[in-house]
């Protein structure tokens, strides 16, 4: 079992849903970047004054609506800003002694994600088709939500993708991940992915909510 990072023992997190907090529209109106993360950054001194030691962010990656329907794991949602805005927020938080944790929505993707789109067009036997789940000849969805396409966690390509995503953002300065809907993902997937992340980032916090709270 991996040793828990020492900084976690005294972590008090301030949780915020960025898209709602900064007043972003429910759906992207265009791909034009709106630099809204600065509206969150101005609250960091207040977070410290409360006695918190961590900034816990809801979804920040490019999505089709509420943030849990990811379009691109490698870009910040343009309704929030761009990579430079996020890097600035990370630095501002770290300068104040705040750790930054982000939401990892790795059970499913938006129906508009290129993997889902390619799978739909090329079929279940295609490279993309093998990265998602199918039911009765159709793309399988998460708990009946038609816009959330379930990833196939038995596919090594999916494990490689999620490992790459997590390490990419940890390389940029993210200190930890909340694993959304982790209870839906087979344990063998996490047993392959999480050690690969901890090997490169041993102080990274990895956690999930109880299934009853999801």
Cite the ranges covered by each PLM segment.
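Residue-level recognition of beta-strand->loop/alpha-helix junctions
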Residues: 56-59, 180
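Short catalytic-loop micro-motif centered on adjacent basic/acidic residues
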Residues: 101, 176-182
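Conserved small/polar residues in nucleotide/adenosyl-binding loops
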Residues: 207-214
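Substrate-binding/active-site clefts of carbohydrate-active enzymes
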Residues: 3-13, 17-53, 60-172, 190-201
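An alpha-helix initiation/capping motif
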Residues: 183-191
């Amino acid at each position: 079992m991996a040793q828990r990072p020492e900084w976690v023992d005294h972590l008090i997190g301030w949780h915020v849903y960025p898209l709602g907090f900064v007043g972003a529209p429910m759906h992207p109106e265009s791909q034009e970047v709106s630099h809204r993360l600065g509206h969150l950054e101005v609250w960091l001194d207040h977070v410290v004054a409360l006695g918190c030691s961590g900034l816990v962010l809801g979804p920040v990656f490019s999505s089709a609506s509420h943030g849990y329907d990811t379009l691109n794991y490698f870009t910040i949602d343009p309704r929030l800003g761009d990579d430079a805005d996020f890097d600035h927020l990370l630095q501002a938080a770290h300068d104040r002694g705040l750790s930054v944790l982000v939401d990892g929505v790795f059970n499913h993707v938006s129906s508009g994600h290129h993997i889902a789109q390619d799978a739909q067009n090329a079929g279940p036997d295609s490279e993309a088709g093998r990265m998602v789940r199918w039911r009765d000849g159709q793309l399988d969805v998460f708990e009946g939500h038609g816009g959330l396409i379930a990833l196939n966690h038995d596919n090594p390509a999916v494990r490689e993708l999620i490992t790459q995503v997590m390490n990419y953002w940890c390389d940029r300065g993210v200190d930890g991940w909340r694993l959304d809907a982790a209870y839906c993902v087979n344990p063998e997937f996490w047993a392959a992915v999480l050690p690969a992340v901890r090997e490169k980032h041993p102080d990274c916090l990895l956690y999930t909510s109880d299934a009853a709270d999801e």
